[in-house]
Amino acid sequence: EAERGGAAKEVFHTFVIGVYFFPLLGGWIADRFFGKYNTIFWLSLVYCLGQACLAFFVFNRIGFYVGLSLIALGSGGIKPCVSAFVGDQFDQTNKHRAKVVFDAFYWIINFGSLFASGLMPIFLSSLGPSIAFGIPGVLMFVSTFVLWIARKQYVMLPPTPPDPHSFLNVCRTALGADVRGRVMAGVGVAAAIGSLLLIPKLGFVIAACLALVSVIGLGGIGVWLQLDAARGKHPEEAIAGVRSVLRVLVLFALVTPFWSLFDQKASTWVLQADAMTKPSWFQSSQMQALNPALVMLLIPFNNLVLYPALRKRGYEVTALRRMTAGIAFAGLSWIVVGAMQVVLNGGTAFSITWQVLPYALLTLGEVLVSATGLEFAYSQAPLAMKGVIMAFWSLSVTIGNLWVLVVNAGVKNDSVIGFIKSSGFEVTAFQMFFFAGFAFAAALAFGLVARSYPLADHYRKA
């Protein structure tokens, strides 16, 4: 049973990595070729096709994985475009409303998630997997049809034409301007090749993601070191745009530990709930419905009560301060589940209702990080890079789930297991406290970087 749970956890986080990797593709084709609306519409149909595959190929492994792949492509591809498309509806005259609308957008997402988390496990057990997978597919098709009907009501910005001063062209110029840039790029490529050579040991997904992180991370450092050398070959506005994006990517990198913790509520926390006492009619996975329900309560509470109260006391709750606190709250939630796991490992059974506390802490962190991060990412992106920067925001989720797979792979090593047991903890409890410490370290680093971060304003002109 433990091996089955571990395998399910690995499949889940691999799927999440795919969902949040494909935004890079979706953001690029939207900004460069098709525009955000067309990308959203056609990839939504791909998503519907993937749901159909899940419904029809429940007992066919190949068909089932094809369905998961199509959903990852469709869902991932539209993610950066939807949030950027929301931002496109605002300009300098009404940008003050953007935060409210982004919060409402996030609230509506969780409204749907509430019903999915609460009802899908019931449909799965009572009606079977084909119906449980088919219902979301039908609803997705209906929403796509509504999007098509309302197409004339939206502000649709055209894709950016080929630009000799694009982000990639400026980066290429900077990297090639001096030996330092070329060395960093070479080290990044070498690290990527080294990661790919580890595919037999780590698996394709982990190795490929590590290769991508190596190229982006080391390449980004090389560009930063040499960006001034691009002056004269590219206009100042293009160089400033690249610098702005690189600054944002540093913050995104520090958010990745939050996603490591957050997405495990659907895997590690569900497995913990299996060991707790609960009514016979209640399934462990239904506990996840608490997350979107709390989001729907916390977003209006924060905007109408908490933030105004803090402002009255002279404390301005900026986006970066909210995100710093959110990462820390996520870490605190994992201290709580870690303590609960220690008690469970000691043989003491207790109610699943105890998970309400860590869910509340994690959800507060989610509202502070995720809902805030969507609006922050959009506001910091130059006009021609809205889709791509939102894709990088989604990529931070991929990397967060990558850390989960890396840690899980690490604890399969006998020497690592021996070290953990010598510490007095069982493996699962040790991992929980490890992830909590990971989040606290990230919150500290994020807060320090945020103190000197120069905010930009890239909303379009009216």
Regions found by a protein language model. Give the residues of each.
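C-terminal ends and interior cores of transmembrane alpha-helices
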Residues: 42-64, 323-347
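Conserved MFS/SLC helix-loop-helix module at the cytosolic interface between two early adjacent transmembrane helices
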Residues: 22-46, 51-52
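Intracellular juxtamembrane helix-capping segments at the cytosolic ends
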Residues: 77-93, 266-269, 359, 366-381
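Glycine-rich segments within core transmembrane alpha-helices of 12-TM secondary carriers
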Residues: 18-23, 75, 96-147, 184-193, ...
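Extracellular/periplasmic helix-loop-helix junction of adjacent transmembrane segments
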Residues: 1-19, 94-100
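Hydrophobic alpha-helical transmembrane and interfacial-helix anchor sites in secondary transporters
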Residues: 29-30, 35, 86, 123, ...
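Intracellular loop-helix junctions on the cytosolic face of multi-pass helical membrane proteins
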Residues: 92-93, 99, 120-286, 301-302, ...
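Helical-face signature of the major facilitator-like transporter fold
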Residues: 68-73, 255-259, 292, 358-363
